A protein has these predicted regions:
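S-adenosylmethionine
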Residues: 1-168
Length: 168
């Protein structure tokens, strides 16, 4: 819920945010956090993200698509618990879900809208390959991001659409 409440704060609690969480326990926790932070512009729903675009077509100016991922960015070599359940099958299953979520998010965006695609993983399949899929199949484009981040790395574009160099 921290991304949701941070966006509400950045918007000075003016506007509207629809936050969707599939997991019921996490959804209830998000509702609680939103309430405790006084983020009155946030409506929290609990539905499959793949259905959001169909229910809310051409509705949103901006979408933050924070997808479920393999979490490779959180692996600690010193802690086997952080990676013991990782598998290539899990990654492939997540890729299929991520594509469906991306399609739904694009459907929910107004024409000319902006979307941020977010993961906490490091692999190409869940990052560059998903965005490349969207460029080729969903009529989206990647815009350059001018933001100062410590240790920022450009996206990999070799073998993909050249605009992927603008991803971080």
């Amino acid at each position: 819920g921290s991304k949701t409440t941070q966006m509400a704060a950045m918007m000075e609690n003016d506007g509207y945010i629809l936050a969707n969480e599939l997991d019921k326990i996490r959804c209830d926790r998000l509702k609680y956090n939103v309430h405790m932070q006084g983020a009155e512009i946030v409506e929290v729903i609990n539905m499959p993200g793949e259905n959001v675009g169909e229910k809310y077509p051409n509705t949103f100016d901006k979408v933050l698509l924070d997808v479920p991922c393999s979490g490779e960015g959180r692996f600690l070599v010193s802690d086997e618990k952080t990676y013991k359940n990782w598998s290539t099958k899990q990654v492939q299953d997540l890729v299929e879900i991520q594509k469906k979520l991306f399609e739904s998010a694009v459907e929910a965006l107004k024409a000319g809208g902006e979307m941020v695609y977010s993961t906490c993983t490091l692999n190409l399949k869940e990052n560059e390959e998903i965005v490349n899929y969207a460029i080729k199949n969903l009529n989206v484009k990647v815009e350059e991001i001018n933001i100062e981040l410590k240790d920022k790395a450009k996206g990999i574009s070799k073998g993909y659409d050249t605009s992927l160099k603008n991803t971080i």
